[in-house]
Amino acid sequence: MENKELKKFEDKYMIKVKGGKYKPSFTDEEKEVFDIEVCKYPTTQKMWLEVMKNNPSEFKGDNKPIETVTWWQALEFCNKLSKKYGLEPVYDLSKSNQDKLMIKELGGKIVSPDIANFKNTEGFRLPTEIEWEWFARGGQIAIEQETFDYEYSGSNNVDEVAW
């Protein structure tokens, strides 16, 4: 069964990022990032309000990014957004795992994030540290254009890419 609402959401808000291999700045080991869909935009207050039924932001505005939320609240948002679109939530936020993040893989297997296979998850989630660095440095396109190791995103000269 096709989920038309999910497809509409993905078409409007998501973008596919091609994965690849690289050596993150914090380790000497090469790591692999798998192809992944990520939101094109920061989570807006309007989207947060629709899912969480509250808006704790200090700087109000439907199209402004949500702020003043905790990391745990962001995980809860991901789970609720997953449920809204009929997807299996990624995070086990049950009381038994309070203060300890656990990942729910498909089939009900609950594992620690450091051994989780995110290809075996279905719902929305936050990017891992390795994925986040991959995005920030330009990913596969930056490797192909030989800009991946620039000091700043897009250049070694901060004046060319910042204000």
How should each PLM-predicted stretch be described?
Residues 3-6, 11, 152, 161:
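Intrinsic disorder/low-complexity segments enriched in polar/small residues
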Residues 5-57, 62-83, 135:
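A short glycine-rich, aromatic-capped structural motif
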